[in-house]
Structures are given as structure tokens and as C-alpha cells.
């Protein structure tokens, strides 16, 4: 069973919010959001299967449906039957899959730099990254990754931080085979014919300068999901929740408050 990190509820019956990262898979990706959320919600974070605390070989036919079912099974085993999901990129796709497969379990979605189906531009970016992986291994993959995640000026001002993050990422690399299986599942996912069936409240967040996933993908996503709301950050790159956490956290907290209105027990 996949291991989850479940924070204490701020009060009995507080809404559960699951945080799901992108292709890197690490639950620590959401560190800059935790303080803004933990007073109002019971937070659940996790390392995706095949990464971090849940390291281990993945099956050959690994799919988005499998990723979603793994998370749902772990949540149910922990006694959590209803939750909101905040997902970044691949994590957003897991949220879409869950909202379609198990709509009774998903109370709301926040989709950050996600998509209905992989754009040709994003596919090209991943092709380049795969070639780097095959030619230069984990080090080449990890060292190139920030170029797709962050704005140039933000990176230029934080070179020591990026070097430290690179070293950590290399030491905890999920493995070439697992990465390629997860990437293949991501590339095969296509929600264009099913998105109209998503019934839960949905907030879509994008960054105008995202190099990896064009912001237009989020506009297409909003058009496909009935009643969904969208906020586009003017700056921040693919990892906008990291580079401009203050702006992102305001959007996230306001969005969750609108979608998950609750009366705190006194």
C-alpha cells in the first residue's frame, strides 16, 4: 500500500485536501503551500508510487488510471472517503482521472498547469528531456529540469539553491525505468472526450510564462469543464507555486474557500 503523509486535522471534520506533485513525484514539492493551508484543512501529501518513500519498480503497463487508483486505495485504507485534490501537471491529471472514475470521492479540484491532452509543444519538451536522460543519465535529466520549471531571472538569483536541489534530486532519483513509465502514462492520458462529465467545483491555475505547458492548455481545460474557474498568473513559470508562492497561495486559499465552504466547529 502506498504510504501517505497525513497531517492532523485542524478540527474534527475539517475538509481533507490532497496535494499531488508532477512528474518528480515528491510530496515535498508543496512545502511553500502547507503553512497557508494547514489551519483550515487536513493536508495529505505523498510521494508518487515509484518515487521517494514509495520507491520500487512499476509495472510495464503503468497508466494514469493506475496512479489514480493507487492514491484512492491508500486514502480509503486511511479512512478518507472524500477529499479535494490540488494537483500540479501530472498531479492535475491524476485529479482529473479521479474526478471521472470516482466522482463521489472528489469534492473539488485545483488543477495547476495541467491539460486535457498533451500539446505538441510539451511533447517536444519531453522528447528533448528523454534524449538527455538516455545520453547523460540522471545527472543530465536533473540539471536540465530547472530550465523547464523556473523563469530565468529567478534561477539566476538562486544558483546555490539550484545546485543544492540538483544534488538532492540526483541522490533521490526515481530511476530511469520508473521515470519513463510514469512519463509514458502522462503522454498517453487524454481527457478531451470525458472532461465535460466532471461535476465537482474546479479551479484552474496557470502561469503565462510557463515554458513546459503553454498557458493556452489551461484555457482549453476551462472551456471543457463545465462551471470551472480559471486564474492565470502573469509570471512564475511551470513551478509558479514555488517561484511566486505568495500570489499562488492567495489564489489557492481563495479558491478552496469558495469551493469548500465549511463552518468550523467551536
From Swiss-Prot:
Leading EC class: hydrolase
Keywords: Hydrolase
S-adenosyl-L-methionine among keywords: no
Catalysed reaction equations from the record: carbamate + 2 H(+) = NH4(+) + CO2
EC number(s) reported in the record: 3.5.1.-
Biological classification of the source: Bacteria, Pseudomonadati, Pseudomonadota, Gammaproteobacteria, Enterobacterales
Protein name according to UniProt: Putative carbamate hydrolase RutD
Pfam families: Abhydrolase_1
Family: Belongs to the AB hydrolase superfamily. Hydrolase RutD family.
Organism per entry: Klebsiella variicola (strain At-22)
Source superkingdom: Bacteria
Free-text function comment from the UniProt entry: Involved in pyrimidine catabolism. May facilitate the hydrolysis of carbamate, a reaction that can also occur spontaneously.
UniProt keyword annotation of Ubl conjugation present: no
Domain AB hydrolase-1 residue range list: 15-239
Gene this chain is encoded by: rutD
Entry's Gene Ontology BP terms: nitrogen utilization; uracil catabolic process
A GO term, aspect molecular function: hydrolase activity, acting on carbon-nitrogen (but not peptide) bonds, in linear amides
